Amino acid sequence: METDFQPKRAHFNHVKDTSSMNMSSSPSETHQGTEQKQEAVSTFTKLRAKLSFDRMVAMGAKMGMPNPLFLCADRAAKATIHINGKDYINFSTYDYLDINTHPEITAAVTEAARVFGTSAGASRLVGGERTPHHLLEEAIAKFMGTEDCIVYVSGHATNVSTIGFLFGPRDLILYDQLSHNSLAQGARLSGATKFPFQHNSCDDLERLLEAKRKDYKQCVFSMDGNIPDVPRLIELKKKYNCMLMIDEAHSLGILGEHGGGIREYFNVDPGDVDLWMSTLSKTLCGCGGYIAGHRGIIQYLKYGSPGFVFSVGMPPVIAVACLTALKIMEREPERVKKLQHISRYFLEYARSKGLDTGESQGYAIVPIITGESMFTGFLATQLLKRGIYVMPIAFPAVKEGEARLRFFLSAAQTEENCRTAIDAIIEEIPHVRQILEKYKAEHPQTAGE
């Protein structure tokens, strides 16, 4: 049986307006229900965020700028990505070690689907536990050097559910100001008192610990992003009797000689960190996330963490895919070396051309900071026209004035492709600036919104 995986184009004007559909046998009830629905829709369309979004779309349309988001690829993304019949140089996905679609993974997943099907069928706590879950958690714990591990079906939910469950109103959470949204959401959900500290600044973190720690029953601080000073963090954890959580979603398989992440990079005792978090969607080519750490904490999470207890278990086929990818990563450290080389090459070439790469250290993700959100979006569109696919990242994901093109590097990428992309940016910047200046002159009332 053939399966058609070709994307079907969706248009907003094809969405049915159901406000006038007769859902009741009573005409008066139907009329009243319609009025309520129309009032709710009207209220939504007047929200400030919705109006801002509408203005952005309108400005893009006036400038002839197509939406660079939600473009649908019809096959796996590698060094190139295939969209609407055309190949683009791909800097938009994080298959860092070029393991996705590896024949071993494909074969293992095929067999797992035959044996286990495609769903766990229930929460793991009450009937959804499958052999691949155990094998994956055991393998990750062994790789990380920890006592135990728990895997969640979502990387975002891993942080939100873990932090939200473990901490409460009597606790203190200190987090890097550039932490991922999931860390901030988890802190908010917990009800704990929370304070951000300056990005990667252990000095600012200690200032907060000195001032705040004594007032709270329990304290945790978390780090992610650029390579933090983990040995110093461990010192602070012990000095102030805190818990330490490290999110290394973008360091597993990237840092260290064998891809062991921050732990291998600094050669620290994994037991000195209470909660090691990472995702399974990047170097391990699946989806979900994990927490690795002390057995007591992990077991507590398995019996109470809402994102684990009240969610269906990870599909067994995904667990098998991640387990197989981990084995390949451990067996083929040359993939890690290739990723590290191409990342440094991209960073050094970009800087040699005078581009702003921020605090990037050349590990898998390199930003090209361009400033204004509209400028960045239009620059991404111009690059797309030239066959280069890279995502614009703008407010609120980053601060106003710090919009950027975010380049994901992978072991599949080439030096030639890196040069092509960077040279294209240099050529397009003055062109995009001219287009924006013209637009602002013609639309002075909307250009600054």
Mark where each language-model region is.
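N-terminal "arm"/small-domain region of PLP-dependent enzymes with the aminotransferase-like
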Residues: 2-39, 45-116, 242
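PLP-dependent enzyme catalytic core of the Aspartate aminotransferase-like
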Residues: 2-11, 15-18, 103, 107, ...
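Conserved PLP-binding active-site segment of the aspartate aminotransferase-like
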Residues: 56-57, 92-95, 327, 364-374, ...
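Conserved PLP-binding catalytic core of the aspartate aminotransferase-like
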Residues: 69, 336-347, 351-387, 397, ...
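Conserved N-terminal alpha-helix of the aminotransferase class I/II PLP-enzyme fold
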Residues: 107-154
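PLP-dependent aminotransferase-class I/II
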Residues: 169, 176-217, 334
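Active-site phosphate-binding strand-loop segment of PLP-dependent enzymes
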Residues: 195, 199-246
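Active-site C-terminal subdomain of aminotransferase-like
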Residues: 240-243, 250, 255-362, 372-375
